[in-house]
């Protein structure tokens, strides 16, 4: 930036900008926020606004761009959404009264993790995450500045940190230490996060008291310091710091949650088609956020789960009362975010009216809850604080038709303040007084067309035409002379005018002061409001789960301590909702104490993945306290779910399907316990056939012998079904098919035993591949099945680590050993599971040329 001949105003800009080099500086100048230099050039491009210059005729004009102050929020939202920070510098004094340059200061730094106001408000949480490291463990704290939620935990490794950040869907991460290059690449390049830095711990320990580890304290303290530094105000709405342990909830990685479509559909990235979409019959924004949290973090405490179940059952048994409850909750606004707006000094009259309307609903909600006559519901009722004094204050103070801004007046109700009522009376009756004076002077003077007018320069005046100047009374004094008339005033008129102007000015100022006082009073209730918000959110989620259970005919699951899984006629809740009850085919799932692994075989499109996801969703719904989609369910309590369902490359990090498979398998076998659930779908398909088969077998044996977790392993390797003769806790199941007159029908029903065929060519037929290609594939299949012998893969002793023995078991399919070797290499290189129909056809053509 060239600083030659810089004006005082621009010098002020540069002085402020140097303190915020990583943020766009919005510099208030009159009715606009201006940006200069590089900020202006970049903002003009990002916001699609005009780029001009200051001092256009100068040798080096300063680039400039601006946005109107009244619509600035929508432009700020765009910059924040793109991952930038915005510093807002306001005028701190009236420009008309300023001596020299108007005083300006940054009043707030808005970052992706600290958004409070938005032109497009979202009911979802917006978490800012802070992480610290003590050389052994990681401290992770997170906060939603818009709701005041504040939590902290400690984690063993960076993989856990990454997963927790992903689960929180954070956009900004605050660091208190130096990351390794690999870790920084993961957060910035792969996860697209904004990294910020803070080395100072917030001094006020009262906000982070409790039994915390040192690394938890530093993470929480640095997070608080950063938030106070960027928001530049006291944050009275911050809730008490909550310490949590990952082990207190059903553990699932972000990849697991994505593959199960828990909070959004993995294919569309939309809520529709997810478990969250299915279960959401909430009526409040607070309830929506809490429901998502329950889905993200199912419980592992049987007592807590049963308590939720009891309340849902009570709600189910009382349709009329539950309907009344749902209708009453519709009148509840977002108390958490309204409280934060009060704390930030941004609450307007409409916000207070929404708060008052909500509080007016609370007694009705409380009465409905009491009518259920349930000890479990009463525990919620007893904690409900209706805040009647606050509701009364808002109801009697704020005009129900008050505008959204505090500068337009008409905010305070008549009768709330005597002085304000007096000023309003003066303004209201002043017009009548003016009319009375006009009539009196017209009659006394004999000037028939005498009238009183008003303008800003002369105020109120008598308008007298030149033809009537001789009739002007002596007590009139001249205020202005025009070509064809004169303007006069009187002492009486001046007195009335003074009273009216004083009333207008005093009324506006007094009304503003009264509103500020009321808002300050509301702020003293924030802690009580937040407690009320939590209870109402809990009630909302529980009634939502009751509505969903009744609508979809869900049942109450049971839990056992025997490691037994019994699901009778279970359904994939989301698929059933999308397809319709009549079309969905239910499946029972059974694991006795002896069984730890189900090996499931069957063709693609037959329902293996749905069967696996059905079990996972049933477990998640059950452990979050929900009723489930089945005729009967009895489950053990799981501590974690690990999945590998669906093939996908991680293109951003450059990892292949097979690498992703192996990494997820590694996480499962390292972290799973005998209380975990593992779901592996076609593990090993990302590499050559025998490599994949060998790894699949080794993983199954490892889980069987060392982990003991309940596992469903879906595979196309039919040779693996022989493992049931060796592994006592493994059973075979398959997807049943009906074969008639050459046509195959997938029944989508799970049956005992292994599948006898793969029906891969039939699936290719359904996909519409050319008949000639299908015919050739059938010929090749027949030849392979005729000429090949058993691979003997199951006979490999467990101690053999190399796959060479497997390869040595392969026979030549052709007499010419050299050609056979060439063809064998070509076959091993084929990644069947990830080929498109066109690639399959091309590959078959190339293989044919080798014969």
From Swiss-Prot:
Any one Gene Ontology molecular-function term assigned to this protein's record: ATP binding
Pfam families reported in the protein's UniProt record: MutS_I, MutS_II, MutS_III, MutS_IV, MutS_V
Gene designation: mutS
Assigned protein family: Belongs to the DNA mismatch repair MutS family.
Origin species: Streptococcus pyogenes serotype M4 (strain MGAS10750)
Name of the molecule in the record: DNA mismatch repair protein MutS
Annotated coiled-coil segments of the chain: none
Residues noted as binding ATP in the record, renumbered to the chain: 602-609
Keyword DNA repair: yes
Record GO biological process: mismatch repair
Protein keywords: ATP-binding, DNA damage, DNA repair, DNA-binding, Nucleotide-binding
One GO cellular component, as annotated: cytosol
Task of the protein: This protein is involved in the repair of mismatches in DNA. It is possible that it carries out the mismatch recognition step. This protein has a weak ATPase activity.
Domain of life: Bacteria
């Amino acid at each position: 930036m060239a600083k030659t001949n810089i004006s005082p105003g621009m010098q002020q800009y540069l002085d402020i900008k140097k303190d915020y080099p990583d943020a766009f500086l919005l510099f208030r100048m009159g009715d606009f926020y201006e940006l200069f230099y590089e900020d202006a050039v970049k903002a003009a491009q990002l916001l699609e606004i005009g780029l001009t210059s200051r001092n256009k005729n100068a040798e080096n004009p300063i680039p400039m761009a601006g946005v109107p102050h009244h619509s600035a929020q929508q432009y700020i939202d765009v910059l924040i959404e793109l991952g930038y920070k915005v510093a807002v510098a306001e005028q701190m004094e009236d420009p008309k009264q300023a001596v020299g340059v108007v005083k300006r200061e940054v009043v707030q730094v808005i970052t992706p993790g600290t958004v409070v106001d938005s032109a497009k408000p979202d009911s979802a949480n917006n978490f800012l995450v802070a992480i610290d490291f003590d050389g052994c463990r990681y401290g992770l704290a997170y906060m939603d500045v818009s709701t005041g939620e504040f939590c902290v935990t400690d984690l063993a490794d960076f993989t856990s940190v990454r997963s927790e950040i992903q689960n929180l869907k954070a956009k900004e991460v605050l660091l208190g230490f130096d990351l390794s290059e690999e870790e920084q690449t993961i957060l910035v390049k792969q996860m697209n996060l904004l990294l910020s830095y803070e080395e100072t711990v917030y001094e006020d320990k009262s906000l982070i008291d409790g039994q915390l580890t040192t690394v938890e304290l530093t993470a929480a303290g640095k997070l608080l310091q950063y938030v106070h530094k960027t928001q530049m105000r006291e944050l009275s709405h911050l809730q008490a710091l909550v310490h949590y342990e990952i082990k207190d909830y059903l553990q699932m990685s972000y990849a697991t949650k994505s593959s199960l479509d828990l909070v959004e559909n993995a294919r569309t990235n939309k809520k529709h088609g997810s478990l969250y979409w299915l279960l959401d019959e909430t009526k409040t924004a607070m309830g929506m956020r809490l429901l998502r949290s329950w889905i993200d973090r199912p419980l592992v405490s049987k007592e807590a789960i049963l308590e939720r179940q009891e309340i849902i059952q009570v709600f189910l048994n009382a349709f009329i009362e539950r309907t009344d409850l749902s209708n009453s909750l519709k009148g509840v606004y977002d108390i958490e975010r309204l409280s934060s707006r009060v704390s930030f000094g941004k609450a307007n009259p409409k916000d207070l009216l929404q708060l008052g309307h909500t509080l007016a609903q609370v007694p009705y909600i409380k009465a409905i809850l009491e009518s259920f006559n349930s000890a479990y519901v009463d525990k919620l009722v007893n904690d409900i604080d209706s805040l009647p004094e606050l509701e009364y204050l808002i109801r009697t103070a704020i005009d129900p038709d008050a505008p959204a801004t505090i500068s337009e007046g008409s905010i305070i109700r008549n009768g709330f303040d005597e002085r304000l009522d007096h000023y309003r009376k003066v303004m209201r009756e002043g017009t009548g007084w003016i009319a009375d004076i006009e009539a009196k002077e017209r009659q006394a003077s004999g000037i028939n067309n005498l009238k009183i007018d008003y303008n800003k320069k002369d105020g109120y005046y008598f308008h007298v035409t030149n033809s009537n100047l001789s009739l002007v009374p002596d007590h009139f004094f001249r205020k202005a002379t025009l070509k064809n008339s004169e303007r006069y005033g009187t002492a009486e008129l001046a007195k009335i005018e003074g009273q009216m102007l004083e009333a207008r000015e005093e009324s506006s100022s007094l009304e503003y002061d009264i509103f500020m006082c009321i808002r300050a009073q509301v702020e003293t209730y924030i802690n009580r409001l937040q407690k009320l918000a939590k209870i109402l959110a809990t009630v909302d989620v529980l009634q939502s789960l009751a509505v969903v259970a009744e609508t979809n005919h869900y049942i109450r699951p049971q839990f056992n301590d025997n490691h037994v899984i019994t699901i009778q006629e279970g359904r994939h809740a989301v698929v059933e909702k999308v397809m319709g009850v009549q079309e969905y085919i239910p499946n029972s799932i059974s694991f006795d104490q002896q069984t730890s692994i189900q090996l499931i075989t069957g063709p693609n499109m037959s329902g293996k993945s749905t069967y696996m996801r059905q079990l996972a969703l049933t477990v998640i719904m059950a452990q979050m306290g929900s009723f489930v989609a089945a005729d009967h369910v009895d489950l053990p309590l799981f501590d974690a779910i690990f999945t590998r369902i669906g093939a996908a490359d991680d293109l951003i990090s450059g990892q292949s399907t097979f690498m992703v498979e192996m990494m997820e398998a590694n996480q499962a076998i390292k972290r799973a316990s005998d209380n975990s659930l593992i779901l592996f779908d076609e593990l090993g398909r990302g590499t050559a056939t025998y490599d994949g088969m060998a790894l699949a077998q080794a993983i199954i044996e490892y889980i069987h012998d060392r982990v003991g977790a309940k596992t469903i392993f879906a595979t196309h390797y039919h040779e693996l079904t022989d493992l049931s003769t060796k592994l006592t806790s493994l059973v075979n199941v398959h997807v049943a098919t009906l074969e008639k007159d050459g046509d195959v029908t997938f029944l989508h029903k799970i049956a005992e035993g292994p599948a006898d065929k793969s029906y891969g060519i039939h699936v290719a037929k359904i996909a519409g591949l050319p008949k000639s290609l299908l015919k050739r594939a059938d010929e090749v299949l027949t030849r392979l099945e005729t000429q090949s012998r058993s691979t003997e893969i199951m006979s490999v002793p467990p101690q053999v680590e190399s796959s060479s023995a497997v390869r040595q078991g392969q026979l030549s399919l052709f007499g010419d050993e050299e050609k056979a070797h060439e063809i064998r290499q070509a076959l091993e290189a084929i990644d069947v599971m990830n080929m498109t129909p066109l690639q399959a056809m091309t590959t078959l053509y190339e293989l044919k040329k080798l014969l």
